[in-house]
From Swiss-Prot:
It comes from Synechococcus elongatus (strain ATCC 33912 / PCC 7942 / FACHB-805) (Anacystis nidulans R2). Catalyzes the addition of meso-diaminopimelic acid to the nucleotide precursor UDP-N-acetylmuramoyl-L-alanyl-D-glutamate (UMAG) in the biosynthesis of bacterial cell-wall peptidoglycan. This is UDP-N-acetylmuramoyl-L-alanyl-D-glutamate--2,6-diaminopimelate ligase. Its cofactor is Mg(2+). The lineage of its organism: Bacteria, Bacillati, Cyanobacteriota, Cyanophyceae, Synechococcales. The keyword Cell wall biogenesis/degradation applies. One of its GO terms (biological process) is regulation of cell shape.
């Protein structure tokens, strides 16, 4: 594909050389100058700390035949750095990158049934449920999200909840080549704010909820909501919106969505998809689901009201795509869950119940504790921490929630990154009443061991915050660490004592 066709309808300005250079053949796209090869087009993406476009001379030196950068990047590294380079300017790099990537990979999103799920919590479980329903209906489906990018015959660990525009379009194109007919993906607020899903039109967009998180990036809840809301308007929304009516921000979003383009779901009220006659238990929930096609009995192995909301959102999305309600409900009992989401680490009958979960926001931690409480006969022990270099304002809130809903709390490290772990722990403790039974143990392995060894039969130990993660970030170093492995070690020590 030549450069001229890639630039069609993009907000770009060719600075040098003359237009004859636009007939150059482009054989690859890169956003990292260090990965450029001969024939590549380098897209200099602005970041939160560094504008990647400033490395355009390095991209040319590595073999890139043309570069597109922002005015800011050009000011940092002017044309004199390489007078012969084919240099193109864009003041809307996310729009430009998305359009170019989609064109280069032959518009894969237009070939697929595309489902996007956004929200603070519930994205991963909801996308897995939609994937489960589509595969059960013999619709070969790609899944892109926090854990991995996968489809039948292929799987890789995800680097981001939502890939960058060039990587995303490449993934979708590969999925199309593999015979996929649909793709369901988690769409993060960062991705929407940074234009990573530009070039994608979604047949279904699902909104799960919005609670405090990522304020280190967005600054305010209003800005956070505005980023999420972009998914529910053109050019992203080309089909139906599916919105959680139990969420206050969901209610706002409903009023912003064009009439006839929105379906709602609710666990506690009336909506297009809602529930009655619910019976919660330690092995899940059963009851009746009301839909536009009538009422149906159902049974789900997923524990907790929040997981019922995820199920309703997924069923509404599947129905929008034409899946019969009966087909979806028939396979709900077979859903095995998601790694690191209410995942039980199995021990012996004399051991406490140990649950690992990704809950790392105030709302998700509260939901986790409330969901676990009815099924724990003894004390509920919560082990958690908060990530460093991230939203600091949620730390005391999570401390208060844990102290209020758990019988015992052990505060520990999560991914401290470049922050002082002692300061993170102090921020959490600041939200906890002085009389609460709280232990502070910065070493996460020691905290998990202490919780499990001190627990009595019938107690529950919740290890919150890291879920599926098999690493811990200390400073700028990533080391191997898995809550589930640490729990198994502690259970084995307990059993051998």
């Amino acid at each position: 594909m030549n450069l001229r066709s890639l630039l069609a309808s993009t907000p770009t300005q060719v600075l040098q050389p003359q237009h004859a250079a636009l007939d150059l053949a482009i054989t690859g796209l890169q956003t990292d100058s260090r990965r450029c090869q001969p024939g590549d087009l380098f897209l200099g993406m602005p970041g939160t700390q560094v504008d990647g476009g400033q490395f355009w001379p390095e991209a040319i030196a590595a073999g890139a035949v043309a570069v597109i950068v922002t005015p800011t990047a050009l000011a940092q590294r002017p044309l004199s750095a390489n007078p012969e380079a084919c240099l193109i300017l864009s003041d809307q790099m996310p729009v430009t990158a998305g359009a170019i990537a989609a064109a280069f990979y032959n518009q894969p999103a237009q070939t697929l049934k595309l489902i996007g799920v956004t929200g603070t919590n519930g994205k991963t479980t909801t996308t897995h449920l939609v994937e489960h329903f589509l595969n059960a209906a013999d619709t070969k489906t790609a899944l892109l999200g926090t854990l991995y990018n996968r489809w039948p015959g292929y799987s890789e660990v995800a680097q981001h909840t939502t890939p960058f525009a060039t990587d995303l379009q490449a993934q979708l194109a590969t999925a199309v080549d593999a015979g996929c007919q649909a793709a369901v993906m988690e769409v993060s607020s960062h991705a929407l704010d940074q234009g990573r899903v530009n070039g994608c039109g979604f047949d279904v967009a699902v909104f799960t909820n919005l609670t405090q998180d990522h304020l280190d990036y967005h600054g305010t809840m209003e800005a956070y909501f505005a980023a999420k809301a972009r998914l529910f308007a053109p050019p992203y929304l080309r089909g139906k919106a599916v919105i959680n009516a139990d969420d206050a921000y969901g209610q706002r979003l409903i009023t912003m969505t064009p009439p006839g383009q929105c379906l709602t779901y609710s666990v506690v009220g009336t909506a297009d998809f809602c529930t009655t006659d619910l019976q919660y238990g330690p092995t899940g929930v059963e009851g009746t689901i009301k839909t536009p096609d009538g009422a149906f009995p159902f049974r789900s192995p997923l524990v907790g009201q929040f997981n019922l909301a995820n199920l309703l959102g997924a069923i509404a999305a599947g129905w929008t795509l034409g899946l019969p309600i009966e087909t979806m409900l028939a396979v709900v009992p077979d859903f095995v869950g998601v790694p690191g989401r209410m995942e039980r680490v199995v021990g012996q009958d004399s051991d406490p119940t140990v649950i690992v979960d990704y809950a790392h926001t105030p709302d998700s931690l509260e939901n986790l504790l409330k969901a676990a409480r009815p099924f724990i006969q003894g004390e509920l022990i919560c082990v958690f921490g908060c990530g460093g270099d991230r939203d600091r304002t949620k730390r005391p809130l999570m401390g208060e929630i844990a102290a209020r809903l758990a019988d015992r709390v052990i505060i520990t490290s999560d991914n401290p990154r470049t922050e002082d772990p002692r300061q993170i722990l102090a921020d959490i403790v600041a939200g906890i009443p002085a009389a609460s039974p709280v232990v502070v143990e910065a070493d996460r392995a020691a905290a998990i061991r202490q919780a499990i060894l001190s627990a009595q039969p019938g107690d529950g130990v919740l290890l919150a915050g890291k879920g599926h993660e098999d690493y811990q970030i200390l400073g700028t170093t990533k080391i191997h660490f898995d809550d589930r492995e640490q729990a198994r070690l502690a259970l084995a020590e307990r059993q051998s004592a």
